[in-house]
Every structure is written in C-alpha cells, then in structure tokens.
Amino acid sequence: MSDKWSPNSWRNKNALHMPNYQNEDHLNKTLNEISKYPPLVFAGEARLLKKKLGEVSNGNAFLLQGGDCAESFADFHPDNIRDTFKVILQMAVVLTFGASCPIVKVGRIAGQFAKPRSSATEVINDLELESYKGDIINGIDFNQKDRDPNPDRLIQAYNQSASTLNLLRAFSQGGFANLNKIHQWNLNFVKGENAAKFREISSRIDECLSFMEACGINGNSVRQLNETDFFTSHEALLLQYEEALTRIDSTSGKWYDVSAHMLWVGDRTRQLDGAHIEFLRGIENPIGIKVGPSTKTEELLKILDVLNPNNEAGKITLICRMGHEKVSGILPKIIRSVNSAGKNVVWTCDPMHGNAIKSNTGFKTRPLKDIISEIQQFFQIHRSEGTYPGGVHLEMTGQDVTECMGGLQEITDEDLKNRYHTYCDPRLNASQSLELAFLLSDFLKEEKLLSKQSSNL
C-alpha cells in the first residue's frame, strides 16, 4: 500500500457498498458546500477518546458503545435523543459499580445514517429499485424518487448531526447527567415486579451514594458527579461525506475526520486493498474494525499494521460479531493471533449482528437470550485466553419498541408487531438495555474478582 495519503486517495481504490449518484455535478456541489461547514467534533475530543480507550486496552476501563441501527430523518426529535442518552447513562452507572472502573460512553448517534446492504437493488411486483441504504443516501419508501440517491440528503444529515450533538453536549454538561438523578431512574426500573433480582445491586449503589453524600461528595462539590464525557461514532461507509469533513487539526497538523469522534469499518467493507481501509488509514481518530465469521486472521493482522502502524493503545477497537452459535469456535484463534503479534487493541463484543433470526410472524428479530449467551461466551473466552473483555457494542434505543424478543417484558413473537419501528435491524428497548446492563455488571464484577485472585497467586 502506497504511503502517500490524502482525504481523497480512497477514490483510487475499489469502493464497495457505495451509492451511484445520477448527477455528479449536484453531488460535487453539495460536497464542496459541506467541506466549508464547521467541524461537528473537535480533534482534541477525539484525542481524549483515544486516551480513554487506551485505558480500556490496558484493562483499566470498560467501553459502552450503543445507539440506533440507523438514524432516520423522520424520527429526529429531542425526546428520542434524550431517551437514548438517558438509557446509556443508566447502563453506565450500573456497569461502573460492577466493573469498579470508569465506563467510556460512545453513542452510535449524530451520524449513523448509512447502512451497507446485502443486495444493491430490491424487487417488488417486478419493479426493481435501489435498496434502502440509509437516510443520508436515499429514502425508505419504495418509489423511484425516494430510492434514487439524493445528494441533498448529505446536508440534511449534517444538519441533524449538528443539532443532535448540540443537545448531547447540553445534556452531558448541564446537569442532566447528575449521578443521583441517574440512580433514581434505575431505582424506578427495579421497582418493577420482574426486576426484583436487580434490587440488591441497586440498593448497594444507593448505600455508596448515601455515604458519599454524608462525606460532602455530591454534584455541587465534585464536577464529575454532575457531568460526563460522551462521544459519538458511526460507520465510515459513505466516503464522499467523510472526505468532505476531514480536516487538518491546527494544533497538531494531523488529519481528523470531524464528522464523529470514532469511526468504524464494517464487516463488508474492510478489504485490505479497498477504499474504506485506505481512507481510515490516514485519519487520527480512534477506529473500530468489525470482526465476523468471515474474518481471515492473516488479513486482520495486515489491516492492523495499516491502520495502526505505531501500535498505539486506544487507536483500534476490534468489534467482534460472531453469533452465539459461532463465537466459541472462531474468537479464540483470532485472540491468540492478535495477542501473539503484540497488537494493542480494545476487544469488544457486538452481540447483535450475529444473532438475527426471522420470526414465525415474519419479523427480523434478535432473541435477548442469544444476545446474553454471546456476551457470556465472550467473557469466558477472554478469561481462558488471559485477555481483557473491554466492552460491548449494542444496537439499542431509549424508546419502548418491541423488536427484540424476550427480557423482563417477556416480548414474544406475537408482540413484535405492536411497536416494530426500526428502519433497519431490530434494537433493544430501554428495559432490555437496562436488564443487559445489570447482567453485565455481574459479569464484570466476577471478572474483577478472578483477576484479583490470579494476581495474588
């Protein structure tokens, strides 16, 4: 791979899962306009996230990454942003207690608009149109006008991302993230009849907060109890958009993609000689790599060399998405290869993408029991390999949807139709996300206990 890189050098490579725009002049005019827009995030924030992820890779923190499968223009509303942010905060408090370490909070938000599809086109009643590829590219309604890729959508996506980030910054720094307030939300959750098993953890958190308050440690005296750091991420799929938002940082002289703090490359676009790897190798942002059953270990090691030539801690997060039936047969070999090569990475579990099934009623869904099973195996495998399970990557929402089966609400196949609102893949609802956080808290506590015991031997 040539060492010469620029924000547009990806254009010389094979770019998979990219839309074909009919009017190139319209596209170029739009991209030129976006290239003059202010950055959505700042380079210093991306550096801070990389530093925090470095702590994760060293086993001193845990990554919670979650949000929508694909953001939509139609669902853009401050309440939806608030509810997703709220449930991530609630999960983080529970996980902090279990892990006894900081939780790095990263949202799939403020830019997660593009989705790769298995088929470039879709056929209904003998009419063949472009597949829906996310609101930044085309519309979900099955008609020619909606399905044709439209450059104007890039500007709408930028504007929505800017508004979302503005609200997230206000929430994270303006008192909404107060620790006592978040804990009160969790207390309300465990009051539910089916959530009794989580009350012990919640009561112990309550005792800790009461003790801190008695010592004069509260949101008024300690900023960290009233505010939080929250970062954004999305898949770097639509490279024209990413290129337009790639800028030189004035303080370091290095290139950053200012569309998000963290970008990731998907399972379908991580070809070593492809356009997406070419683009990502030149930016300083933290980068995620989706690792699935099709991953060839030798190629993954070469990708790590390309994307992180200095083996920098916090630069690379490997997002493992195997499926609960395959993870035990695939992940150990990958861990051993990466570990023996001495690569600094954050290991996270994406228990969503490998566990989708088609229900008897025809809905694409994900059983919560399968999601939990993959996470459990992920932890067990890392324990066996002597490596650190550094995080989870979830498709979730703060809304009360019925898209994934199971959980305390006991959502069944028949219930899916009630509030199945996703534009793409099924998401955990707020209750299922919190339930998962309480279970994860137990896993993390056990992990810390075993780690302490082994260090004392």
State each model region's role.
Residues 48-50, 273-276, 303, 332-334:
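Glycine-rich, charged/polar anion/phosphate-binding loops
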Residues 53-56, 94-96, 279-280, 381-385:
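A general structural signal for short secondary-structure junctions and capping/turn motifs
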Residues 1-4, 450-457:
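Basic/polar N-terminal segments that are highly enriched at the extreme N-terminus
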Residues 64-69, 106-109, 349-352, 395-397:
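Short loop/turn segments at strand-loop or loop-helix junctions that form parts
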Residues 71, 76-323, 366, 374, ...:
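Active-site-facing alpha/beta catalytic cores
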Residues 300-310, 315-347, 353-403, 408:
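Non-transmembrane, aqueous-exposed alpha-helical and coiled segments at domain scale
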